[in-house]
Each structure stands twice: as C-alpha cells, then as structure tokens.
Amino acid sequence: ANMQHAGALRIDHVMALLRLWWVPKTAENAGGGAYVYYPIMDLLGILALESQRNQAVIIGEDLGTVPDGIRELLAQYNVYSYRVFFFETAEDGGYISPAHYPVQAMATLTTHDLPTLIGFWHCDDLRLGRELGLYKDDAQLHQLFAQRHANKQRILDSLHGHHVLPQDFERSVQHLGMDKTLNYAMQRHVASASSQLLCLQLEDALQMSQPVNIPGTSTEYPNWRRKLSQPLEQWTQDADIKQLFSDISVRRQN
C-alpha cells in the first residue's frame, strides 16, 4: 500500500525483517527481553515482488546493530543501504569521504531522529536533552559535549581537505558558529557521494535549528508537529536555496 503512490520507500529499522527485540510485560526492564526471528527470505521475496509491481525503489535503514551478512543479503535483493554522514567514520574517528560510500545506497547528512545541522553544530540537541532529562548525570553530558567538539573539528578538517570551503575559511571550531557558508558546504559535500541516491533535509536548507523529532520522548516534546520556517511559495523563490540546489544537481551529475 505504501508503494502505490511513491517511487521509493524507506523501511525504518530494516533489521525487523530478520529479528526484533521483544520485551515481555513481566520483565523488569528491556534487558529481560529476547530476539524473535522472522522468515527474512520470505519477507524479502514479498518485498522484491511488490517493488517490481509498484516500480518502487526500496531503501533499508540499516543503522545500529547489524548482524554479519545482512547488508550483503539485502544488497542481493537490491535493497539500498542507508549511509548517514555523521555515522560514517573511520577507525581513527575521521569522517569517511562520501566518494567512498557504497553505490547501492542513499546518502544523507542527518535524519529525522537527529538534530539539524545548526542544532548539531551549536549543541542545541545536547542542551535540549538536558532540559528533558535524557542524560543520567552531568558527567555523561560533559562527555557528549567533548565528543561533539572533537567531531566538529574532524568535520571541518574533512571539508577543508575536500576543498568545499573557501581557503580563507576558519580552520578551528573553537569559536566557529554554523553560518550559511558552512551549512551549504556540508550539503554540497555529501552531494558528491558515490551513492546513487541522495536525501537532504529541507530544514537544513532553511537553516532551522529545532528538531522535528527527539527519540526517547513522547509528551516531553512536540514530535512531528514542528512546521517549516517558510511556506513553499517563499523558500522556492529564495536565491540562496535555488543556488544550493543547482550546485547539488551539478555534483550529482558528475
């Protein structure tokens, strides 16, 4: 049903085709659960059939804990992988060049479950998480702030290394805020990915800071109710956004 009106379908947590962690009501916590396995070969066969019937591409959100061999199995059925820039790091902590992403994948900078680019860079998500009581103590929060600072520097180093920022652009994140130059450079950078598909968040083009969803919350935050900062008729006429999309189109064609 979901494929009938779209050319592509993204399956959230595609590992559910293989297994799900079930927690009985009687368990004291999530640790009292167990994996329940599903007939993945049958489900993949049905998925492939419906994909052909509806002429829809399938993207599998294969993040988190991924059992060995599953990505290869999904690839055999032409299910596209999902590569998020923030998660694509090497053993030394540096960011993998989007040019090295798998071809059979959809590349993206961030997702609906992550902060916007401005929110990430300014650590708005960490402060909001503190307000919502998402962290067990201040020590955990301090560690997250330190990790974020290091990640930002690695991102900036990578952007300079790929020459997507002006040569005279700041090279230290110590006092560097997120501006339009940096924002759009990150989007152009991931647009150069070797992956066949690209997904970008409209709120990043609009330079919005508030997230649309915060995992682990329900009534604490108005998930999925945040509106875009500009109506369709307005942002489609924005010269900077039009130039950004034009630059992205050129990079996707190369």
Spans of features found by a protein language model:
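Catalytic cores of glycan-processing enzymes that make or break glycosidic bonds
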Residues: 1-254
